[in-house]
């Protein structure tokens, strides 16, 4: 079914309006001529002809159908312009590209051409009745709303005198409560009634601009602000921050501002773990592996980004836990339904980390020290030259810990070594070191680029391995080391080609190398002693020094086009290629291989906004092309390498929609749906060389995700604010990927569960009084059940309708803080805070196996933390003290692996602007 050319659209004004704007405002998109330069190979020639034919067909169809339904209204045709597709056939150039991107043509270009053809074929034959019905219903509502629109849209961009975009600039209508803020790109959009208005543009540190306009049509107006050394009188308007706007969007998303807690925060994991519906389960102390779940879906079902680019680009071992918190402005958590603009195949959700975007030079440095020999140091800085637009941003983060906390009630040998007893020994081989250093340099505010940056980064981690996947498997000499280099180029241009169009492009390449050292013929115990063994510690085989080189290439292009104040289009292309070059220095039985997994993801989004922004709609579609090239053949009985072809290309299609309607500030409702696809990543398919076996026959996960939420902000009295949100969700997952533990070997493997259904509810409420007293509480319930009725042999499955094991299903958290202003000096403040986290007990294995009263379970946990922060000189200098787990509870997470007990930390931070 072709949605845009079916009879419904032809017989309504929707298609006519949409096509009129598209044809008249997109220069050369439908009227250009595509030429091919010499030197292109036949496959590239076919691609050119395919694209050219598609453009010509679209042009003819749009103009023909507009002519049928409008005889008097003519469409302004843009000047005819040639579009030249440059395809080089130079052999030397091909060789250089091939040596840098590895097999570029085989793994990237061919699947990309295949993807373009499959997009057209898939869309033409896809049958999604439920989605179409919802789509048509919302479009009908949109048609009704078009007649009710009597607002004029004033939009534009605010910059300083050097052309640098300014964020959080207020654009207000004088003598009214109407107003808005600019975003990170300096863009704004404000709806007003037709007529004459006076607009006030103001920002702290800049001179205020007042201008009067007589508006009867939509208008674009840019402003340039001049710096001011005098205080600017504030303009009172009702506006919303970017975090508030995102929370109130059509999709289910939480935003976490880092700035209020940056002085006491040591790791992003601490902040994210206090969010409703989100649970982080760590295997140990600082630097340990962790698993993050969103609404019951976890592991690699959740994707991580930094400024819209996959976090993997910094290195495979750069995570939320060791990313410098000084870099971060806020964290966006998408639940279940992920916008196509991120260009990902996430199934359960996504975490997008937004870095700081200060407009002036600054230095932000911090150092913390704590229990278990823990040290952290972070530096983030920015140096700007206002006249030239030159910007340099260095950053570095260092973490170190011995993690020598005590293990409670574990089996160990007595002093003579002749019998086993239970004791509380210290961890003795769990040291961790990480380094992340990066520098970014570029220019802003030029006519050819609003932002152009080149960056380079280096990350390194050294991790001693103390246990396997269970704590009874003790190591004493094994370790894992990794380092990664990254170079990237980022280009942003606002009003690209035409007014309202924004282009963002990123090219990134990472050289990632990890080594697992497992050479000791020893078996260790918790007392630190050992006996000589005939096998190495991790794999139980010959000594090994195993190398994994996983180069990562990322290409991301995002084109956003705001057609007017009510309609927008977003086109996103994302390519991700991960190599897997593995070999061993000692183990001659280990078979080297050079595998690769390449993904192409194309996303298209159409958004609407009506009734002064009260109603927002979003519709999106995603096309996925997966191209694995698997060459490893060893351990075929475990990995399934004898059951797959070496190189395959498969295509998948996803889609979704979202609707939000805000009745008034205290009450709003939103619903969203996505048919999502999640392709297995290299770590799941190919293992990690230490504790995870490969499984090359893994199937992609598919899920139908639904969210329904009520939320609102209520001001019961002056200086009092209450925010609440209640959310219900459904996740119907096929080929659910989860970990299977092989306890005898201390190994894990990712496997498919045919079907899992997850349903749940969550709620959160926040209270704020005058920015001083802040309270928060949330609770989450998740019911994940196995839906496989029969095994592969046809026999009934004993675990049918059982809860999925080893996953928290009921948990919650609470926070309280109070800030004293001007307590000792005029420009200081003292903040007292505490947090509480609770997790209900859950079974370690399937509840159908064994006796429910005696089978292993992870007990309920109650973790309390307290902190105090003192700041002076307008937050320039800050000292924070924290006690985590001050009740010294025994805390377990993954596979009953103990976490640290009571610990103390101190942090000093200085911010110079």
Question: What feature does the model see in each segment?
Answer:
Residues 188-191, 309-336:
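Short acidic/polar hinge/loop motifs at secondary-structure boundaries
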Residues 159-161, 169-174, 202-206, 216-260:
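Short, acidic, small-residue-rich periplasmic hinge/interaction motif at the N-terminus
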Residues 116, 222-223, 325-364:
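A beta-strand signature from Gram-negative outer-membrane beta-barrel systems
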Residues 269-310:
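Extracytoplasmic beta-strand/coil segments of soluble accessory domains associated
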Residues 439-461, 480-640, 644-666, 672-674, ...:
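Face-selective signature of the C-terminal outer-membrane beta-barrel domain
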Residues 368, 387-471:
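Periplasmic-side early beta-strands and strand-to-turn transitions of outer-membrane beta-barrels
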């Amino acid at each position: 079914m072709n949605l845009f050319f079916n009879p419904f659209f032809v017989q309504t004004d929707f298609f006519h309006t949409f096509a009129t704007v598209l044809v008249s405002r997109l220069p050369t998109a439908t009227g250009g001529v595509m030429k091919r330069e010499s030197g292109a190979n036949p496959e590239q020639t076919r691609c050119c002809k395919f694209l050219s034919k598609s453009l010509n067909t679209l042009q003819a169809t749009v103009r023909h159908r507009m002519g049928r339904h409008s005889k008097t209204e003519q469409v302004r045709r843009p000047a005819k312009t040639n579009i030249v597709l440059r395809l080089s056939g130079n052999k030397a150039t091909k060789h250089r590209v091939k040596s840098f991107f590895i097999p570029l043509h085989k793994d990237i270009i061919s699947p990309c051409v295949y993807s373009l053809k499959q997009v057209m074929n898939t869309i033409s034959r896809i049958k999604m009745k439920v989605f179409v019905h919802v789509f048509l219903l919302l479009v009908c509502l949109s048609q009704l709303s078009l007649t009710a629109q009597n607002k004029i849209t004033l939009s534009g961009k605010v910059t300083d005198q050097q052309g640098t975009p300014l964020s959080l600039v207020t654009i207000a209508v004088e003598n009214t409560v109407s107003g808005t803020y600019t975003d990170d790109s300096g863009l704004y959009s404000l709806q007003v009634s037709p007529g004459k208005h006076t607009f006030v543009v103001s920002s702290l540190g800049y001179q205020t601009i007042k201008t009067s306009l007589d508006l009867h049509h939509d208008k674009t107006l840019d402003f340039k602000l001049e710096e001011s050394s005098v205080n600017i009188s504030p303009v009172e308007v009702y506006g919303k921050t970017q975090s508030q706007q995102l929370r109130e969007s059509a999709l289910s998303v939480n935003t976490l501002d880092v700035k209020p807690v940056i002085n006491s925060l040591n790791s992003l994991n601490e902040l994210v773990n206090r969010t409703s519906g989100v649970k982080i389960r760590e295997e140990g102390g600082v630097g340990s592996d962790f698993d993050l779940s969103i609404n019951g879906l976890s592991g690699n079902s959740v994707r991580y980004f930094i400024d819209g680019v996959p976090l993997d680009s910094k290195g495979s071992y750069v995570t939320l836990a060791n990313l410098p918190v000084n870099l971060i402005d806020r964290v966006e958590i998408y639940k279940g339904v992920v916008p196509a603009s991120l260009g990902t195949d996430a199934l359960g959700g996504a975490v997008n980390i937004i870095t700081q975007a200060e407009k002036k030079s600054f230095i932000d440095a911090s150092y913390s020290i704590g229990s278990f020999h823990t040290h952290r140091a972070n530096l983030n800085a920015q140096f700007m030259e206002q006249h030239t637009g030159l910007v340099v941003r260095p950053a570095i983060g260092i973490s170190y810990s011995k993690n020598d906390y005590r293990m409670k009630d574990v089996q160990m040998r007595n002093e003579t070594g002749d019998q086993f007893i239970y004791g509380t020994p210290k961890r003795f081989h769990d040291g961790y070191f990480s380094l992340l250093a990066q520098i970014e340099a570029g220019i802003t505010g030029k006519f050819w680029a609003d932002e152009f940056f080149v960056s380079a980064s280096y990350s390194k981690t050294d991790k001693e391995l103390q246990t396997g996947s269970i704590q009874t498997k003790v190591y004493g000499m094994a370790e894992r080391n990794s380092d990664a280099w990254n170079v990237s180029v980022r280009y942003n241009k606002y009003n690209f080609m035409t007014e309202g169009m924004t282009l963002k492009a990123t090219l990134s390449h990472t050289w990632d190398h990890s080594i697992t050292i497992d050479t000791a013929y020893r078996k260790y115990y918790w007392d630190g002693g050992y006996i000589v063994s005939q096998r190495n510690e991790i794999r139980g085989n010959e000594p090994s020094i195993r190398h994994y080189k996983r180069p990562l290439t990322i290409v991301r292009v995002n084109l956003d086009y705001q057609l007017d104040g009510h309609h927008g289009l977003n086109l996103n292309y994302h390519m991700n290629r991960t190599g897997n070059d593995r070999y061993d220095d000692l183990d001659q039985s280990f078979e080297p291989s050079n595998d690769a997994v390449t993904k192409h993801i194309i996303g298209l989004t159409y958004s609407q906004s009506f009734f002064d922004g009260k109603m927002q709609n979003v519709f999106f579609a995603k096309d996925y092309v997966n191209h694995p090239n698997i060459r490893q053949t060893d351990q075929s009985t475990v990995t399934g390498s004898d059951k797959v072809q070496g190189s395959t290309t498969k295509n998948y299609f996803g889609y979704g929609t979202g609707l939000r309607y805000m009745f008034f500030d205290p009450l709003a409702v939103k619903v969203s749906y996505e048919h999502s696809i999640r392709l297995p990543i290299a770590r799941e398919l190919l293992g990690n060389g230490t504790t995870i076996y490969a499984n090359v026959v893994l199937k992609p996960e598919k899920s139908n995700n639904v969210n329904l939420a009520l939320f609102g902000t209520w001001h019961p009295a002056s200086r009092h604010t209450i925010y609440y949100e209640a959310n219900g969700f459904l996740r119907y997952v096929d080929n659910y990927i989860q970990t299977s533990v092989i306890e005898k070997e201390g190994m894990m493997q990712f496997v498919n569960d045919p079907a899992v259904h997850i349903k749940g509810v969550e709620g959160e409420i926040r209270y704020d009084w005058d920015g001083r007293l802040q309270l928060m509480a949330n609770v989450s319930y998740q019911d994940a059940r196995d839906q496989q009725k029969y095994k592969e042999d046809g026999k009934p499955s004993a675990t049918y309708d059982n809860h999925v094991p080893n996953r928290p299903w009921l948990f919650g958290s609470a926070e309280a803080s109070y800030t004293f202003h001007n307590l000792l000096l005029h420009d200081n403040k003292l903040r007292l805070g505490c947090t509480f986290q609770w997790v209900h007990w859950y079974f370690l294995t399937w509840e159908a196996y064994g006796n429910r009263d005696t089978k292993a379970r992870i007990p309920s946990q109650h973790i309390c933390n307290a902190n105090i922060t003192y700041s002076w000189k307008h937050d320039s200098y800050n000292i924070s003290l924290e006690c985590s787990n001050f009740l010294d509870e025994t805390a377990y997470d993954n596979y009953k692996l103990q976490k640290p007990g009571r610990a103390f930390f101190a942090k000093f931070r200085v911010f110079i602007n």
